[in-house]
Amino acid sequence: MELNGVEIEDTFAEAFPIKISRILITAATKRWATVAAQEATGFGTSVIGCPAEAGIEKYADASETPDGRPGVYIQFCTFGFKSLEEQLLERVGQCILTAPTTAVFNGLPDAEKQFDTGRKLKYFADGTESETEVGGRKMHVIPMMEGDFLVEDTLGAVTAIAGGNFFIFGDTQMTTLTAAENAVDAIGAVDGTITPFPGGIVASGSKAGANKYKFLKATANEKFCPSIKDKVEGSEIPADVNCVYEIVINGLDFESIAKATEMGIRAAVAVPGIKKITAGNYGGSLGPHKFNLHDLF
């Protein structure tokens, strides 16, 4: 099938289960909420080499937050609840508590799984901590040099989905980059999803394992590398394609990732010079969740 004259390959993106925690950071200004969110989600591109995948989900107006201040929702993703709890404690403690004017609220208050992250962070106050209530939520108050840091008693987590994806094939690097940027912007409007790679874009799509260097668990996906398309047997790169970017999507449920994939692809194919959209899968061996591209439209 074609969308806006661009081929949409009849294939599927293969995704897998992941544990996700979602939190809300508020601050005196949107700038400082954003700074804290960016710091907390750093080194969070891929579980191939990072302790968690992480990203900004969406911004919240002051009218939408428990303390009436600008906010940012972020997500952290790991394979197990134990490692997720560890990442929450470390990232909130080192990257958000340390940032000016911030507070942290539970982004999944109805989740069955709740971590006592706030209850543990209160010990930083070394006996000067107290409790209060904000918007009906139990908060721990930690006195600090600038004033008080507030963190909700518990932070929730759920079993969700990671690894939704699609590939954008373009005639030039700048054309393809523009399409990828537009795709990420469109996905940003879909609640419950993040694009964890830098700026939401993967420049270095990988394959599982290695052909030559067996000590590596992931290596360059040479069949999708345009600069060696004439040298690699079975290259997936057409003659008129000179750049490929991958968009990876994690989310709280199947429906939100499906919607994000659709919105992202629609935005990408609106850019002149885009030649093809496809997706990455391992024939069903990676995970149970399949996002068939043709079914999205």
UniProtKB/Swiss-Prot annotation:
Biological source species = Methanococcoides burtonii (strain DSM 6242 / NBRC 107633 / OCM 468 / ACE-M)
E.C. number: 2.3.1.101
The metabolic or biological pathway listed in the UniProt record of this protein is:
One-carbon metabolism; methanogenesis from CO(2); 5,10-methenyl-5,6,7,8-tetrahydromethanopterin from CO(2): step 2/3
The UniProt subunit note reads as follows: Homotetramer.
Location within or outside the cell: Cytoplasm
- Record-level GO BP terms: methanogenesis, from carbon dioxide; one-carbon metabolic process
Q: What does this protein do?
A: Catalyzes the reversible transfer of a formyl group from formylmethanofuran (formyl-MFR) to tetrahydromethanopterin (H(4)MPT) to produce 5-formyl tetrahydromethanopterin (5-formyl-H(4)MPT) and methanofuran (MFR).
Q: Which InterPro entries match?
A: ForMFR_H4MPT_ForTrfase (IPR014053), ForMFR_H4MPT_ForTrfase_C (IPR002770), ForMFR_H4MPT_ForTrfase_fd-like (IPR023447), ForMFR_H4MPT_ForTrfase_N (IPR022667)
Q: Which UniProt keywords apply?
A: Acyltransferase, Cytoplasm, Methanogenesis, One-carbon metabolism, Transferase
Concerning its family, UniProt says: Belongs to the FTR family.
GO cellular component labels: cytoplasm
This chain belongs to the protein called Formylmethanofuran--tetrahydromethanopterin formyltransferase
Please write the reaction equations for the catalytic activity of this protein: N-formylmethanofuran + 5,6,7,8-tetrahydromethanopterin + H(+) = N(5)-formyl-5,6,7,8-tetrahydromethanopterin + methanofuran
Single annotated GO MF:
formylmethanofuran-tetrahydromethanopterin N-formyltransferase activity
